[in-house]
């Protein structure tokens, strides 16, 4: 609801505080409108200092004679309330400070919930975190059907729980099972999903949102129907016992005990159901205070701030060029993924060139299948699917490329082929067109070597699967112009990606820190450690999958192709054990051909196989490598060997200027390879251990396993000077 839409209704202005976040007006029909508009900000966020302002507005409402009810709307174009201002937590020195913060919000929202007249939240745009908790305190909730409208409680993603009554009001409104699902995942709901769950009372076109809110006020405070019997059953002692046991086990299986917030959410919801709302709110505030002081929450909040700051940067000193049309070379898996995110997220027309029609058809089918899945999930309308599909077209020649502003190349990793692509684009596209290569290993300066306009050649390294992986590495070579850098970053943002600008050197950043990690896992394997023990060690450490499993997923042929390049250009520390060649020679490529270090069941799992793994360790690999699998090392030792090499290489990358800052290195590792977010990234993790401790561990490992563990000079110097990467 915009201010313009608010003003469209006949309004009698009451006391109006223009400098305030909240303004109060009364309509001729005696319905009060409270508009939320944080001055000078793009979106509304809640801060502790706003409480007094809101109470003043509430006081005005109470003094307004004949008032029939209140409607809360936003003065921002596409945001209701994006949540509480997370930076407030940084000002809390103790758990008591953070608890007080939660209690302030609870008391304010309790006043809304207990207001004797109907209060309606008219929601358009993001309604998240504290914004949804505010809406939950209202008697009615109506929202727009607009795609920008999203509702959720994402606090768990910051290592927190909803601290202003959300853990207590949501289960009572929609049932404990659905409420736990929303809070434990941090998922965001669209309007129709929210309506189906009972989170909102109506989802309507934006044009009539205020009208429907007015209707709700006129109906008075609603008498809520009891929840369905299935949900009521779960609130009883027996239902609670089984539900919370199941949820706790599933949650622990996912978090492996690394994240305290999900467990506290479960505890607090359970306490509120067993002991009542008041006790539940007290438990919520205490838990919020304690979680705010945890290392895990600090790490997750730091990542949030890092990612947010990157979104506001162009990566360059210049402004980007406008992007109206995008070209893609190659209709394979990567080309198809890049085309998909460009059209569906960037809403940009995409022209794909492939050597045959089959490649183009594969891209169209790939995007159709992904969009159809969203249609089936009710997250997209069939008409929207059709509109997005119309943005993608294909050709086997260069027709349509004359109007492209940027062309992303996703062909085979062959230098001469990529150089040929540069020449053909320079011939068939306009002079201003940027050429971006999705290479994972070839230096960009070599790809640009024969270009007529090398300043318009850059690397854009996407990660597979493109529709899921959030990171893009932007790789300028020495001659790349600032405008080209800014434009490449701009495209990545339009595609919904987080972009980091990295140096043009073998492996760039992500692959360079990943290869030693995987190679060390291979060293453990050829020494006799079982595959599942190695992978389990790193999953227990906090990675989403183990290194051997990851190699299978990426493709053993693809994953090992970059290793010789790194060995040649950066040294023997990147070398994998020679015996690993036997795996490749045996035709094992990983999941894509059903044979790797694991064996994969063909086809999708049947319904009776739900929960069963679709893969198992292929024991014939041990025969191939001439080893007898037997565990001699603790899981923690295996994890330490693999992770320490990654940390050491990350510091080298910073020292050499491959990454611009520790922040970029942390984002790259977490978003690119799944470095455990609760550590905050490699550099935050080093700071938590201390440089001296990391050097000590590396030297011990060097004495046991060789020169690949020699600590880099930068790390040694920082240890000697007792320095850290962050203030």
Curated annotation (Swiss-Prot):
GO terms for molecular function: 3-hydroxybutyryl-CoA epimerase activity; enoyl-CoA hydratase activity; long-chain-3-hydroxyacyl-CoA dehydrogenase activity; NAD+ binding. Residues 321-727 are annotated as: 3-hydroxyacyl-CoA dehydrogenase. Gene3D superfamilies: 1.10.1040.50, 2-enoyl-CoA Hydratase, Chain A, domain 1 (3.90.226.10), NAD(P)-binding Rossmann-like Domain (3.40.50.720). It is found in: Cytoplasm. The record marks 133, 155 as: Important for catalytic activity. The keyword Ribonucleoprotein does not apply. GO terms for biological process: fatty acid beta-oxidation. One of its GO terms (cellular component) is cytoplasm. It catalyses: a (3S)-3-hydroxyacyl-CoA = a (2E)-enoyl-CoA + H2O; a 4-saturated-(3S)-3-hydroxyacyl-CoA = a (3E)-enoyl-CoA + H2O; a (3S)-3-hydroxyacyl-CoA + NAD(+) = a 3-oxoacyl-CoA + NADH + H(+); (3S)-3-hydroxybutanoyl-CoA = (3R)-3-hydroxybutanoyl-CoA. It comes from the Bacteria. Residues 16-205 are annotated as: Enoyl-CoA hydratase. Pathway: Lipid metabolism; fatty acid beta-oxidation. Catalyzes the formation of a hydroxyacyl-CoA by addition of water on enoyl-CoA. Also exhibits 3-hydroxyacyl-CoA epimerase and 3-hydroxyacyl-CoA dehydrogenase activities. PANTHER family: TRIFUNCTIONAL ENZYME SUBUNIT ALPHA, TRIFUNCTIONAL ENZYME SUBUNIT ALPHA, MITOCHONDRIAL. NCBIfam families: FadJ (TIGR02440), PRK11154.1 (NF008363). Heterotetramer of two alpha chains (FadJ) and two beta chains (FadI). This is Fatty acid oxidation complex subunit alpha. It comes from Photorhabdus laumondii subsp. laumondii (strain DSM 15139 / CIP 105565 / TT01).
């Amino acid at each position: 609801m915009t201010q313009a839409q608010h003003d469209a209704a006949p309004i009698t202005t009451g006391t109006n505080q223009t400098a305030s976040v909240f303004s109060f007006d009364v309509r001729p029909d005696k319905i009060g409108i409270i508009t939320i508009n944080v001055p000078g900000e793009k979106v509304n966020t809640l801060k502790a200092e706003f409480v007094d302002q809101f109470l003043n507005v509430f006081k005005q409402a109470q003094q307004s004679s004949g008032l029939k009810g209140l409607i809360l709307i936003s003065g921002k174009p596409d945001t209701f309330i994006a949540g509480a201002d997370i930076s407030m937590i940084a000002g809390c020195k103790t758990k008591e400070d953070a608890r007080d913060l939660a209690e302030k919000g609870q008391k304010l929202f309790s006043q809304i919930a207990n207001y004797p007249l109907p209060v309606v939240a008219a929601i358009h745009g993001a309604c998240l975190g504290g914004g949804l908790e505010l809406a939950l305190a209202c008697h009615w909730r109506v929202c727009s059907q607009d795609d920008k409208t999203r509702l959720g409680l994402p606090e768990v993603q910051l290592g927190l729980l909803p601290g202003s009554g959300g853990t207590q009001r949501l289960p009572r409104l929609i049932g404990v099972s659905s409420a736990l699902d929303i809070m434990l995942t941090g998922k965001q709901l669209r309007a129709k999903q929210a309506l189906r769950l009972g989170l909102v009372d109506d989802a309507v076109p934006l044009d009539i949102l205020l009208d429907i809110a007015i209707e709700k006020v006129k109906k008075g405070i609603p008498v809520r129907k009891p929840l369905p019997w299935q949900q009521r059953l779960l609130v009883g002692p027996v239902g609670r016992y089984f539900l919370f046991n199941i949820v706790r086990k599933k949650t622990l299986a996912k978090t492996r005990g690394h994240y305290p917030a999900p467990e506290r959410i479960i505890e607090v919801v359970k306490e509120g159901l067993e002991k009542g709302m008041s006790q539940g709110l007290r438990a919520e505030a205490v838990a919020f205070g304690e979680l705010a002081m945890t290392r895990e929450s600090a790490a997750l909040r730091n990542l949030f701030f890092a990612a947010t700051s990157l979104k506001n940067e162009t990566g360059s000193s210049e402004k980007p060029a406008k992007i109206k049309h995008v070209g893609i070379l190659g209709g394979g898996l990567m080309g198809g993924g890049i085309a998909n995110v460009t059209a569906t997220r960037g809403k940009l027309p995409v022209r794909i060139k492939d050597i045959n029609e089959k490649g183009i058809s594969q891209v169209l089918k790939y995007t159709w299948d992904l969009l159809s899945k969203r249609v089936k999930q009710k997250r997209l309308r069939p008409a929207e699917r059709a509109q997005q599909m119309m943005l993608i077209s294909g050709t086997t020649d260069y027709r349509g490329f004359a109007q492209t502003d940027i062309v992303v190349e996703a062909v085979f990793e062959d230098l001469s082929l990529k150089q040929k692509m540069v020449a053909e684009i320079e011939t068939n596209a306009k002079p201003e067109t940027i050429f971006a290569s999705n290479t994972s290993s070839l230096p960009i300066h070599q790809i640009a070597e024969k270009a007529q306009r090398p300043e318009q050649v850059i690397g854009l390294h996407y990660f597979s699967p493109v529709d899921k992986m959030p990171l893009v590495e932007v790789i300028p070579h020495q001659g790349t112009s600032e405008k080209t850098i800014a434009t490449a970053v701009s495209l990545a943002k339009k595609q919904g990606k987080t972009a980091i600008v990295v140096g043009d050197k073998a492996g760039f950043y992500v692959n360079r820190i990943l290869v030693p990690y995987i190679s060390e896992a291979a060293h453990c394997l050829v020494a006799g450690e079982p595959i599942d023990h190695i992978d389990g060690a790193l999953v227990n450490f906090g990675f989403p999958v183990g290194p051997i499993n990851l190699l299978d997923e990426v493709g053993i042929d693809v994953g090992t192709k970059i290793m010789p390049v790194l060995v040649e250009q950066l040294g023997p520390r990147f070398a994998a054990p020679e015996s690993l060649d036997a795996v490749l020679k045996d035709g094992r490529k990983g999941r894509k051909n059903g044979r790797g270090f694991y064996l994969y069941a063909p086809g999708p799992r049947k319904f009776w196989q739900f929960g069963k793994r679709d893969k198992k360790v292929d024991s014939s690999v041990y025969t191939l490598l001439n080893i007898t699998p037997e565990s001699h090392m603790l899981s923690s030792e295996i994890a330490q060997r693999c992770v320490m090499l990654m940390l050491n290489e990350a510091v080298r990358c910073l020292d050499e200027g491959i990454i611009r800052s520790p922040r970029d290195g942390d984002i790259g590792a977490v978003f690119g390879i799944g470095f455990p977010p609760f550590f905050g990234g490699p550099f935050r993790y080093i700071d938590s251990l201390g440089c001296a401790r990391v050097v000590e561990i590396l030297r011990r490992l060097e004495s046991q396993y060789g020169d690949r563990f020699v600590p880099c000079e930068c790390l040694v110097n920082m240890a000697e000077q007792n320095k850290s990467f962050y203030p």
